[in-house]
């Protein structure tokens, strides 16, 4: 049952990620990997919100956590795409953009996680 929950959640997360990828490409262009940047930051914020809620409120089942955190968020976020995008920027000669992308993604994702946890902590 656990594998099925992760499988279904992962499919949903991947579908939403694909939606964000295509939408950002249409709206913002493809010169900078806005799609992966947005996905990594928002995924970390949501993970922080969920982790904070579960840590302070508890009460959710392992199946729920597997479906939501491992499945949906695991399918939605990815640092393998992050690494590829950074390498592609570098390979294209956009070294400055690559540095901004890597530093911005890491700093904002970690800040988003702490922010999500702090928000839940303040609400409980």
From Swiss-Prot:
Single GO molecular function: metal ion binding
The entry's keywords: Cell inner membrane, Cell membrane, Ion channel, Ion transport, Membrane, Metal-binding, Sodium, Transmembrane, Transmembrane helix, Transport
Domain of life assignment: Bacteria
GO term, biological process aspect, one: cellular detoxification of fluoride
Known catalytic reactions: fluoride(in) = fluoride(out)
Compartment annotation: Cell inner membrane
Membrane spanning residue stretches: 1-21, 36-56, 66-86, 94-114
Residues where Na(+) binds: 74, 77
Pfam families membership: CRCB
Activity regulation, short description: Na(+) is not transported, but it plays an essential structural role and its presence is essential for fluoride channel function.
Membrane topology: Multi-pass membrane protein
Any one GO cellular component localisation term in the record: plasma membrane
Family: Belongs to the fluoride channel Fluc/FEX (TC 1.A.43) family.
Function recorded in the entry: Fluoride-specific ion channel. Important for reducing fluoride concentration in the cell, thus reducing its toxicity.
Record's protein name: Fluoride-specific ion channel FluC
Organism name: Rhodopseudomonas palustris (strain ATCC BAA-98 / CGA009)
Gene this protein is translated from: fluC
């Amino acid at each position: 049952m656990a594998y099925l929950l992760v499988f279904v959640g992962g499919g949903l997360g991947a579908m939403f990620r694909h939606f964000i990828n295509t939408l950002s490409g249409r709206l913002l262009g493809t010169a900078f990997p806005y799609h992966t940047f947005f996905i990594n930051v928002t995924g970390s914020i949501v993970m922080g919100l969920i982790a904070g809620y579960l840590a302070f409120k508890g009460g959710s089942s392992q199946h729920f956590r597997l479906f939501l955190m491992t499945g949906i968020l695991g399918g939605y976020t990815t640092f393998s795409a992050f690494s590829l995008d950074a390498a592609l920027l570098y390979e294209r000669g956009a070294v400055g953009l690559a540095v901004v992308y890597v530093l911005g993604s890491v700093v904002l994702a970690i800040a988003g996680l702490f922010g999500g946890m702090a928000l839940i902590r303040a609400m409980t």
